Amino acid sequence: GSGTFERYIRHAGEKDPAQTLTTTFRMSNVDGARYRQAGGKKMLEQKMAEAVDAGTHALPRKKGSVPGMVQKNCIATVAVRVANVDATDFEQLTAAEIEGRRQAFAYEHFLRDCVPGCEDAKIIGLSTQIGVRETRRVHGEYRLTREDCMSVARFKDCVLLCGAPIEDHRAGKNGEDETAWACVPGGQAYDVPYRTLVPKGRDELWVAG
């Protein structure tokens, strides 16, 4: 019954804060050559840290990435960070949507003011919805572990391969970045078994996330 199934559902944030949410955005009119000549990502992080410490721009973090796009003079960004949100609560999620967009335009002003090559940059698009990293955690017939990923585990009931790094996005104090990365050794990919998609206590459902 449903009661049995619910025993195997946990919610992110019950014990430790849930991972942070992110609104991505795209910008045009970026002089990539000038940005790289000024120091690129290392320079960007230095400028972000200076802005946070000086209080000149309301940025939520001291690190971020601005990879280039196929379109000329355009960049995509991963810099917004909205913390302490239960994304299963519609009021909190709505507030996070608003905050994510506010932060995006704060970054636009920062990039124009402080980053060489971005003086004329402008936002040309925002993600249609804020990116939610975790909410409910459904326990499957098998639970993939960190050790499985790092040891490049193999399973007879493998249904897909994954080579992406393990990411854990947390909010630090005063803009410090507490994101933890763990890359799969040797650029390999580990198996994800079918049993991870089958919730404990049910036989008519698949879940993924």
Per-segment meaning from a language model:
Residues S2-A208:
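Flavin (FAD/FMN)-binding glycine-rich loop and adjacent Rossmann-like elements that form
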